[in-house]
Amino acid sequence: MARRGQGSGSRPLAVKVGHARRRKPSSTEWLNRQLNDPFVAEAHRLGYRSRAAFKLIQLDERFHLLRPGMRVVDLGCAPGGWTQIAAARVGAGKNRGAVVGIDLLAADPIPGATLLQGDFRDLATAERIRAALGGPADLVLSDMAAPATGHAATDHLRIVALAEEAFAFAAAVLRPGGAFVAKVFQGGAEGDLLAGLKKAFASVRHAKPAASRAESAETYVVATGFRGPPAA
């Protein structure tokens, strides 16, 4: 593996990982990408759980989603990058806001946040989330993505299905005027999701944060001004 150093122009040299005999080429590409990603390095420096934290930071800077005292749900929260940012910005745990993270996987504790393990689609788990919030949610976040299959059309359909389920949950817990943010992949199958969001929210916009990798098809739908669940 090449060492990171400084050239004559003080520009950092790229780190390059060689192809180990037992390592798949895709794994080597992932390692090279991680080692040369400035958001990965900055997340490590700041103590964020993942580089995804910067995506929420950038979305918040653009859309002003997080405010002190808010009640926030983070669906699919593990490892906790978005939950960290939300808890810090709403003042969770300081007798003000409340942030509840839920995931099928366990996540290490985050100061000020309540982390639950389970499936938000399960009625009993949904009730646990409501109880932990202590009232209607102001914001529901979803950075969820199903494991990639390598087939773009399949991955698109799977993430749209997750976003639709997250929307259904949000419609059940949001207060009037609340907001919903979810990751989707571009691909054309999100028409029904967007139609439902436009009925339920005053504003529906798309954004791709700078922290999203350029080659990724991911984008985020930002819906604000919740008016109530769309009519069947």
Sequence positions of predicted segments:
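Class I S-adenosyl-L-methionine
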Residues: Q186-A232
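A short glycine-rich, Lys/Arg-flanked "PGG" loop and its adjoining helix->strand segment in the class I
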Residues: V160-P176
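Conserved class I S-adenosyl-L-methionine
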Residues: P68-A78
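Glycine-rich helix-loop-beta junction characteristic of Rossmann-like nucleotide cofactor-binding loops
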Residues: E61-R67, L133-G134, A172-V173
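Short glycine-dipeptide loop
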Residues: G93-R96, L174-A179
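Class I SAM-dependent methyltransferase Rossmann-like catalytic core
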Residues: A2-P68
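S-adenosyl-L-methionine
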Residues: R96, I102-T149
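Conserved SAM-binding loop of SAM-dependent methyltransferases across substrates and taxa
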Residues: P79-G93
